[in-house]
Amino acid sequence: MNIAFIVILVIFVILILVGIIGIGFYNKLVFRKKKVIDKFNAVYMSLKERVDIIDSISNIITTNKLHEDNILMELNKMKEAILENSSVNETLPLINESDDLLKKALSLDSIYDELLKDKIYMNLKDTFKNNQYKIMYSIEIYNEEVEEYNNYKSKGIANIVSKIFRFSDYSYYKKENDI
């Protein structure tokens, strides 16, 4: 056999192996990225449940003729912000903002005693607390998935493949204050 033919055959086999390995790493990166997006969607769906809580609080404020126009206006702005933003970097800060705003709105019973007798209002406080725990659990899973993705993406051949195909890092969610 001709030595040039053997060299070409070896190079061809090496290129095929590199291609197969590269495709494997690419597929794993796509799979991990999809898992991160799925976990973020779980966080986002829980955040959208807050829109229902915001609507209910707004109804209670207007029904009971409470003079809390500032809170009502802030609630409407928060609702719009949640519904308009769906990217990770825009949505994660809304969690802290909505937590603070809803805590403020749900503390109106310290000013208006009639709210303590309102069963809908009291159920709403429980619903909010459950929603907080659900979001925190979803965020914990999201952060774990982001860590796995970012770590995998930054190592060895996966790093090369991720740079070639421009896979970007995902942001972690950092809670400003605990529940």
What is each residue range found by the language model?
Residues 2-179:
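A helix-centric hydrophobic-segment signal that preferentially recognizes long
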